[in-house]
UniProtKB/Swiss-Prot annotation:
Pfam families: HSP20. Belongs to the small heat shock protein (HSP20) family. InterPro entries: A-crystallin/Hsp20_dom, HSP20-like_chaperone, HspG1-11-like. Residues 1-159 form the sHSP domain. The keyword Metal-binding does not apply. This is Small heat shock protein hspM. Residues 36-46, 61-95 have a biased composition (Low complexity). Disulfide bonds: none annotated. Keywords: Stress response. Residues 35-101 are annotated as: Disordered.
Length: 159
């Protein structure tokens, strides 16, 4: 039995097409990128195949920072000696907190159309193509093909 494994992480099973043309195994597909991890319906193809910098909002940290800023503003308003300095400090704190709320990361995943080819000609005569089977689980495509039962020995009679 021949077992072929291909890593296709991040690809949906329905977006994979497998064919054998002559003695060439062709695997084609489309890898999509979700614009927002919470919204899986918003998909986009990026044909650049380059790392990207993406922004991600974190609601829990921004709300806790806003609560801290409100507490700082209340403390500043209670202190009557340095109102001008405290207002400047609270404005600076608001600017700093809005900058720290933005999270950016680099994504090194490629997206878009892909094609993989495998030349089966060295073993093609050994393959029983009626038994070919493909499974896709956890980003791993496994193709299995049984060997033929035909022997390679052929006796030829002389006429």
């Amino acid at each position: 039995m021949f077992v072929l494994n291909f890593e296709l992480a991040g690809v949906n099973k329905n977006d994979i097409k497998i064919e054998i043309k002559d003695s060439l195994l062709c695997i084609q597909g489309e890898k999509y990128k979700s614009m927002n991890n919470n919204n899986k319906n918003n998909l986009q193809i990026n044909n650049d195949d380059k790392p990207m910098i993406e922004e991600e909002d974190d609601d829990s940290s921004s709300s806790s920072n806003n609560n801290n800023n409100n507490n700082n503003n209340n403390n500043n308003n209670n202190n009557n000696n340095n109102n001008n300095n405290n207002n400047n400090n609270s404005n600076n704190n608001n600017n700093k907190s809005s900058k720290t709320n933005d999270k950016k990361f680099i994504s090194e995943r490629s997206f878009g159309h892909f094609e993989k080819y495998l030349d089966l000609s060295p073993v093609f005569y050994q393959l029983d193509l009626s038994t070919i089977n493909a499974q896709f689980e956890d980003g791993l495509l496994t193709i299995t093909v049984r060997k033929t039962n035909l022997s390679n020995n052929i006796k030829i009679q002389i006429n």
